[in-house]
Amino acid sequence: MKLNKKERQKLLQQTISSTPFITDEELATKFGVSIQTVRLDRLELSIPELRERIKHVAEKTLEDEVKSLPLDEVIGEMIDVELDDQAISILEVRKEHVFSRNQIARGHHLFAQANSLAVAVIDDELALTAKANIKFTRQVKQGERVVSKAKVASHDKEKGRTVVEVNSYVGEEVVFSGDFVMYRSKQK
């Protein structure tokens, strides 16, 4: 039995609500309509496309996990975190990140991405950078994507310090590396 538009849209909302990662193609098959019809229904109902739904779910999950700073204070887009273990963020280098005369990224943006990731990976309400040993290994240009990966290297429970190693890449090439000694309030 074919559903009318109102019924289909109601079921579409329920389906996406319960299964946010369902594709338009899967929805079209489920409801026996074209992909374009599903897209028009989503548009009418103000339901974002799959990519935006995935991003929203990921942000909500990360927001619940990251304790040391609000997600909007992480420089770049945080895509993964396992507290006191590892984290990953992506920074798309845009016009506002570069020098106007040569389109080379300003170093403080790369440092800020790495430092905020080092803070975010700490499983504590308070995490501060006590010391950083950093190295820029190549210039980054406008339009490049910097993937920053943080890994907790060690804990000194007595001193309340955690060492976080951060490497930032454009493709396979390391463009920045740093060891961040992080102060934390809890001795975990």
From Swiss-Prot:
Transcriptional factor involved in regulation of membrane lipid biosynthesis by repressing genes involved in fatty acid and phospholipid metabolism. GO terms for biological process: fatty acid biosynthetic process; negative regulation of DNA-templated transcription; negative regulation of fatty acid biosynthetic process. Signal peptide: none annotated. InterPro entries: HotDog_dom_sf, Transcription_factor_FapR, WH-like_DNA-bd_sf. CDD domains: hot_dog. Keywords: DNA-binding, Fatty acid biosynthesis, Fatty acid metabolism, Lipid biosynthesis, Lipid metabolism, Repressor, Transcription, Transcription regulation. This is Transcription factor FapR. One of its GO terms (molecular function) is DNA binding. It comes from Bacillus pumilus (strain SAFR-032). NCBIfam families: PRK04424.1. Belongs to the FapR family.
